[in-house]
Amino acid sequence: MKKSLSLVLAFVLAMTMLVGIASAEEGKILNIWCWNTEFQSRFNDYYPEVKEIAEDKSTTTLNDGTIVKWTINPNENNNYQNKLDEALLAQESAAADEKIDIFLIEADYALKYVDSPFTLDVRADIGLTDEQLVGQYKYTQDIATADGVLKGVTWQATPGLFAYRRSIAKDVLGTDDPAEVQAALSDWDKFDAVAEQAAAKGYKMLSGYDDSFRTFSNNVSAPWVDGTTVKVDANIMKWVEQTKLYTEKGYNNKSSLWNDVWAADQGPDGKVFGFFYSTWGINFTLLGNSLADSNAPAEVGNGIFGDYAVCEGPQPYYWGGTWICAAAGTDNAETIKDVMAKLTCDKDIALAITTDTQDYTNNVEAMDELASSDYASAFLGGQNHIALFAKAAPNIDMSNAGPYDQGCNEGIQTAFKDYFDGVVDIDTAKKNFETIIMEKYPELTEVVWP
């Protein structure tokens, strides 16, 4: 009897071990969800394990045979989040090769996913160590932390600067030197004065209504929501006042972020003094918009490549950023660990990304090294803009970030566009914002204005 029981126990133990091994075995399909090709490009270009990329870029094959399947759903009208949410809710019942393994999130809605059961603990579940993570900028971890648990990591840090046209600065201020231009734009009163000077010369200071929004919204005194009350910060209303003034005086071109007018204003025929941009915007958007021929080499002689420079501007701010999250239910934890470690913790890879693309990477040591080097951006006329980013990045404060940021930020800009256009008065714009918020977030009960 004892012998039989021992055999049974041995069999059960063996089966348990086999099940454990099977469950720990890495899947051969790595499903990654994102909203554009930015991370896909970084992954394909800089993850050392990439072996082959499909011609249509729908898949990437790794050295161990793992096939990365890319699902890219554009952000427009909340499309990305809607489809992601639907897939995550079905994650438990999905076949192993259909489960999401990695998905990307943005700062404005990071807490929605970070503070949820759909994301894994980067340390406890994935296995990254404090030693690996210590070199990242603190704010990038603060954004992706809930109840002390880190749920996402990023390869980039996104402090903001003011990118201006050198040729226009020379015409308006008599200089294009970043230090001298910064002295002329170091607070909002000075910024407004230069806007008046620029208008007298036939230029617009900004392209449109939303350009300066992040600079104001990142310098608020409290989060958007307190309990169930939306509290509109006084600094948000300063943005409203400035934008209305600029519109009435012709200091902007009445464009909206991402529309065709806004993009054209950054190009060869543009007459706009400058644009508020964070790190990704300079290399991912502004550079592309500056070219006369997008199919020709990005170099001096193609459009206004080389005619931009950057300075700190009137207030420090950050804008955007993309975080890598491991999805609960993944069978690729070890692969995800390696992806996160290589793309967000490796100094040499961080240096390569920044040197090649001008993206500002999330490695303090690497960025400080470039900041003090002879690194020069040809796009920015030979300027070492990394030095300005390195100065700004450690000071980014995420203490006022919250789960309602995306809806409130987008809602206030949408509601007040009609006010800037002269279609409604300010009281109607306020009521329209209240309607947008109450419809989007039924749990919120009131909006308080300063």
Describe the residue ranges of each PLM region.
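Helix-loop-helix "hinge/cap" segment bordering the ligand-binding cleft or interdomain interface
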Residues: 125-134, 142-212, 224-256, 328-334, ...
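Conserved N-terminal structural module of periplasmic/extracytoplasmic solute-binding proteins
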Residues: 6, 19-111, 130, 351, ...
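Extracytoplasmic/periplasmic substrate-binding proteins
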Residues: 48, 238-338
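Hinge/lid segment of periplasmic solute-binding proteins
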Residues: 92, 103-161, 189-192, 298-312
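Periplasmic-binding protein-like
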Residues: 42, 166, 341-370
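Long, aromatic- and glycine/proline-rich binding clefts that accommodate carbohydrate-like moieties
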Residues: 303-306, 354-418, 446-450
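Short helices/loops that flank or line small-molecule/ion binding pockets
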Residues: 81-99, 103, 116, 169, ...
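Bacterial N-terminal signal peptides
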Residues: 10-16
